Amino acid sequence: VEVLTQTPSPVSAAVGGTVTISCQSTKSIYBBBYLAWYQZKPGQPPKALIYTASSLASGVPSRFTGSGSGTZFTLTLSDVZCDDAATYYCGGADYTGYSFGGGTEVVVKG
């Protein structure tokens, strides 16, 4: 399974600002179809934000944008809100299995 390396935590963001989180894989993600982004808050299950690298999951606002291919992927949060404070994970698959990045905590400052 590939190793996924994310932007180190914490990342500070201002309300109304923009945050970019990177995810780098040691192997090419299989056809880019198996790269996803998740949001996790304390005491809550992870919430899927992005699938197939750039597709928004149902109910996720368009402020969240996924991009990238191969071994380099990015999650961008625009017009940051206080509710966006969370830990964000990328997850990806190659032919041997699925793995997750270490997570990037986003701290929102008003």
UniProtKB/Swiss-Prot annotation:
Residues 24-36 are annotated as: Complementarity-determining-1. Residues 59-90 are annotated as: Framework-3. Residues 91-99 are annotated as: Complementarity-determining-3. Residues 37-51 are annotated as: Framework-2. GO terms for biological process: adaptive immune response. The record marks 98 as: At the hapten combining site. Gene3D superfamilies: Immunoglobulins (2.60.40.10). Keywords: Adaptive immunity, Immunity, Immunoglobulin. Residues 100-109 are annotated as: Framework-4. This is Ig kappa chain V region 2717. The lineage of its organism: Eukaryota, Metazoa, Chordata, Craniata, Vertebrata.
